[in-house]
C-alpha cells in the first residue's frame, strides 16, 4: 500500500507502518487511525480499499508529509542562517545547535576526525 509516495510495509501494524512516512510520528499515526475508525493493531495487509482511501484523505487534508515537510524544515534552517542568529551560525558551521559540548563528542554533526599535527618533541644532542 502506498501513501504519500511511500510503500508501507504490509506485515506491520498500521500505527507503526504509518511512521515510515516522513512527517508522521507515533502520535500523528494514532490520531489518523482514530479519525479513520481503524484499530491501530490491524496490519496494513488487512486494510481494505475504503480504509486505505480514508487514511490517504486525512493525511492529504491535515498533514504536511514527505517533500513538503522536508522543504519547510530546510526553509526554516535557511532562514536562521540568513538572519545570522546563533542557531544559524551553528548550522552553517555544522556544529551542534542545541548547546551540546563539542570539546569531545559531537562526531555525528562534525563528521570524521580531522587529525591535527601534534607538538614536535625536542631532539636531545
UniProtKB/Swiss-Prot annotation:
Residues 92-125 are annotated as: Disordered. Transmembrane segments: none annotated. Pfam families: Ribosomal_S13 (PF00416). Located at the top of the head of the 30S subunit, it contacts several helices of the 16S rRNA. In the 70S ribosome it contacts the 23S rRNA (bridge B1a) and protein L5 of the 50S subunit (bridge B1b), connecting the 2 subunits; these bridges are implicated in subunit movement. Contacts the tRNAs in the A and P-sites. Keywords: Ribonucleoprotein, Ribosomal protein, RNA-binding, rRNA-binding, tRNA-binding. GO terms for molecular function: rRNA binding; structural constituent of ribosome; tRNA binding. It comes from Pelodictyon phaeoclathratiforme (strain DSM 5477 / BU-1). This is Small ribosomal subunit protein uS13. NCBIfam families: uS13_bact. SUPFAM superfamilies: S13-like H2TH domain. InterPro entries: Rbsml_uS13_C, Ribosomal_uS13, Ribosomal_uS13-like_H2TH, Ribosomal_uS13_bac-type, Ribosomal_uS13_CS. Gene3D superfamilies: 1.10.8.50, 30s ribosomal protein s13, domain 2. Belongs to the universal ribosomal protein uS13 family. One of its GO terms (biological process) is translation. Part of the 30S ribosomal subunit. Forms a loose heterodimer with protein S19. Forms two bridges to the 50S subunit in the 70S ribosome.
Amino acid at each position: 500500500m502506498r501513501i504519500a509516495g511511500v510503500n508501507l510495509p504490509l506485515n506491520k501494524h498500521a500505527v507503526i507502518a504509518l511512521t515510515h512516512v516522513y512527517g508522521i510520528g507515533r502520535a500523528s499515526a494514532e490520531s489518523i487511525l482514530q479519525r479513520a475508525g481503524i484499530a491501530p493493531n490491524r496490519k496494513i495487509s488487512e486494510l481494505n480499499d475504503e480504509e486505505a482511501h480514508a487514511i490517504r484523505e486525512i493525511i492529504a487534508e491535515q498533514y504536511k508529509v514527505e517533500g513538503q515537510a522536508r522543504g519547510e524544515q530546510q526553509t526554516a534552517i535557511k532562514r536562521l542562517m540568513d538572519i545570522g542568529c546563533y542557531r544559524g551560525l551553528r548550522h552553517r558551521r555544522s556544529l551542534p545547535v542545541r548547546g551540546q559540548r563539542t570539546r569531545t563528542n559531537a562526531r555525528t554533526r562534525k563528521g570524521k576526525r580531522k587529525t591535527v599535527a601534534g607538538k614536535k618533541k625536542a631532539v636531545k644532542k
